[in-house]
Design a protein with these regions (language model features):
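Anaerobic metallocofactor- and corrinoid-dependent redox/one-carbon enzyme cores
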Residues: 1-682
Length: 682
């Protein structure tokens, strides 16, 4: 059900966006996602539907297919339907596959029409962080995932010469997508920054569309006298529909305070109203916020009774009472130190939690005032798809294992610490993995500087190559990551693409060393995105909150019979070890995740050089974080040549203790499909 909801959400988004863009640009507007550098431009659509979209109108057929499949998937959740667990899991995988098809159609549409970067490894660096926002200007904040209203806000500013006089900023995926359209827009941060920025009072007008928006956003906007404009029929927020009212009348009502907000379902009109209202009310509002000063924090903290109710409801179990105790004595540092680990859910401020009705999250943000002002970072604008020439360049090294793997950081902001995303990205970019990112994870990666004062996007190149760090785009850009794996099979291995999912997934699972990480996963969309990777045979690691999905897809490395493949050259069944061991793995700490990444990047097709490189990273990280050698090395060493040269003596000793025997076929042509066997041994 969770995966079907996620797929339905992205498909609904695709339907709404494609229809709006067809209305604005015409059904015959050409699809262009690479300016000549991408000829295999819709790998998911071709693989699943056999459709090669050339115009916006073609995308409607793809979305229609997704809608039909989701209806059937949702019907399977009804009482008295599927009774077999494996068949039910198959439907989960199917939902993920459909999700990637819908997201691909969605992003292709907006790249082709809104002048987003088109497979550009040198996409520009844009500003991110609360500290980048110029509070002396009227500020418009956009929140959500549907970018047309934000684009129309900017276009109205541009037409009226207000580009440099009004600040346009965003939270969540709309923020990423508007910075793909213009470098003048700024990103506040990921989903977890939503409430803290709204409560700061910096935003004069808040414009929301769909997905990942707080249900109490209207109440929070009213607390700081900000105007709320809803632009999507999926998220009215209880506001009256003013779409057909005269623009001047709407502006007058909002500026005078007669109405706290309005629902305007026409993107162009919403853009005009947002800018005009922001310019009119900014001088009067004076950025009224509800974040307390230091002296107020100290006085408020003295009322804390140390009942620990706030800590009990905190998803990250933050030591709020101890921080409040220190704050009561005038030391605000412990409270400020909680800021980066807070996900902004505000459970600690829910009704009935604190007996004295204190607001720990608000106090936390107030104590971090200086830190927040210094949040000024650079993120690379979402580049879109991977170029065909990039795939040709890295296809061989990835399949052979010489590039250790592709690490994809994706998903929501429900993490124990946002820095983990940046630390993981930095670690593996240094180790010559290819690091790609989307959405909130891509934003979090930017909000950390290394010893040289650089973010990962400034420190590493943006090309899809060893040691590269790429921001592919927003949530709907995830199919460009999974699509890269598909393109390796098609472009590098010359496998037939159209309507050939089984063979391509078999190729990816057995040959393409890739792993996804959703460190802050929490939404239904995150689960459907993950299941789309699973169906291609790509493992996914989630953070500690990922266990709340109440499922995992874990392998049993102790059961040798589970780890056999066919050698397509001979038809012989060959033991290849647990490569990869798991498909869906919840990690408790970033260290556990970092050890698991090179392990899950191992594939049966690895050459001895490639396996040696991957084992080197696995053993090195295991020793770095656990202080000892892994206990399962013998399962991944097929021949003496697989052993990293610098660790040979230690590993040979372990192999001897385990009674290891050299594999008869150390490097097979692996497949799980009997039909792929070219010649059977007599």
């Amino acid at each position: 059900l969770s995966c079907s909801i996620g797929a339905a959400t992205h498909t609904g988004h695709a339907r709404h966006l494609v229809e709006e863009l067809i209305k604005k640009f015409g059904r015959d507007h050409p699809i262009n996602v690479g300016n000549g550098s991408v000829y295999l431009e819709a790998p998911h659509a071709r693989l699943v539907t056999g459709i090669k979209p050339k115009t916006l109108g073609d995308l409607e057929d793809i979305v229609e297919y997704c809608e039909k499949e989701i209806v059937h998937l949702l019907s399977c959740c009804h009482t008295g339907q599927e009774g077999d667990n494996i068949d039910f899991e198959s439907k989960v995988f199917h939902a993920g596959m459909i999700d990637h098809v819908a997201m691909e159609a969605c992003d292709m549409a907006q790249i082709s029409t809104y002048n987003f970067p088109k497979a550009d490894p040198e996409a520009p660096l844009v500003e991110i962080g609360i500290g980048t926002i110029d509070t002396h200007k009227p500020v418009i904040l956009v929140i959500g995932h549907n970018v047309p209203p934000a684009v129309e806000i900017y276009e109205y500013m541009k037409r009226n010469g207000l580009e440099n006089d009004v600040e346009l900023c965003g939270i969540c995926c709309t923020a990423i997508d508007i910075t793909r359209h213009t470098q003048k827009a700024k990103i506040v941060g990921p989903l977890s920054h939503q409430l803290r920025f709204v409560r700061s009072g910096v935003a004069d007008v808040i414009v929301v569309d769909e997905q990942c928006i707080r249900t109490d956003i209207l109440n929070e906007a009213m607390k700081v006298n900000a105007v709320l404009i809803s632009t999507h029929y999926k998220n009215f927020q209880g506001l009256p529909d003013r779409t057909n009212d005269p623009t001047d009348e709407i502006v007058n009502d909002l500026v005078s305070g007669k109405a706290p907000g309005a629902c305007i379902l026409n993107s162009e009109k919403a853009g005009e109203v947002a800018v005009r209202v922001a310019v009119a009310i900014a001088p009067k509002r004076r950025k009224m916020g509800i974040i307390p000063e230091d002296s107020q924090i100290v006085e408020t903290a003295k009322k804390c009774t140390q009942c620990y109710s706030c800590q009990r409801v905190c998803p990250n179990n933050l030591p709020i009472p101890e921080a409040m105790k220190a704050a009561a004595k005038g030391d605000l540092k412990p409270l400020a130190n909680l800021y980066e680990r807070c996900i902004g859910c505000v459970r600690c401020e829910s009704e009935g939690v604190c007996p004295n009705n204190l607001h720990p999250h608000t106090l936390m943000v107030g104590a971090s005032r200086i830190k927040i002002r210094e949040e000024k970072f650079k993120i690379r604008a979402g580049r879109g798809p991977i170029q065909d020439v990039e795939i040709r360049r890295v296809g061989g090294p990835i399949v052979m294992g010489e590039i250790p793997g592709v690490v994809a950081l994706v998903g929501c902001a429900n993490w124990p610490d946002w820095k983990a995303n940046a630390l993981i990205a930095e670690e593996f970019a240094k180790r010559n993995f290819i690091v790609v990112a989307t959405g909130c994870a891509a934003m979090a990666m930017a909000m950390y500087r290394n010893e040289e004062g650089l973010t990962v996007y400034e420190a590493f190149p943006g090309a899809f190559d060893a040691g590269g760090v790429l921001n592919v785009g927003s949530c709907v850009s995830n199919p460009h990551i999974s699509g890269a794996a598909i393109k390796i099979a098609s472009i590098f291995a010359k496998r037939k693409l159209n309507s050939n999912y089984e063979e391509i997934a078999d190729y990816v699972h057995n040959r393409v060393g890739a792993v996804g990480i959703s460190w802050g996963a929490m939404s239904q969309k995150a689960s459907s995105i993950a299941s789309g990777f699973w169906r291609l045979g790509i493992p996914v690691i989630v953070g500690p909150h990922g266990s709340k999905y109440r499922r995992a897809l874990l392998g049993r490395k102790d059961r040798d019979e589970d780890w056999y493949v066919y050698d397509a050259r001979t038809g012989e069944r060959v033991y290849v070890g647990p490569t990869p061991e798991h498909l869906f793995f919840p990690a408790e700490t970033k260290e556990e995740a970092m050890v698991m990444i090179p392990k899950l990047c191992m594939r049966p097709s690895d050459t001895t050089k490639g396996r040696s490189i991957k084992l080197n990273h696995y053993i090195d990280l295991y020793r770095k974080f656990y202080g000892t050698m892994p206990d399962d090395i013998h399962l991944f060493v097929r021949t003496i040549a697989d052993i990293p040269v610098t660790m040979k003596d230690e590993v040979l000793k372990i192999l001897k203790e385990k009674g290891w025997k050299e594999s008869k076929v150390p490097s097979p042509d692996p497949t799980l499909l009997p039909r792929m066997i070219r010649k059977r041994r007599e």
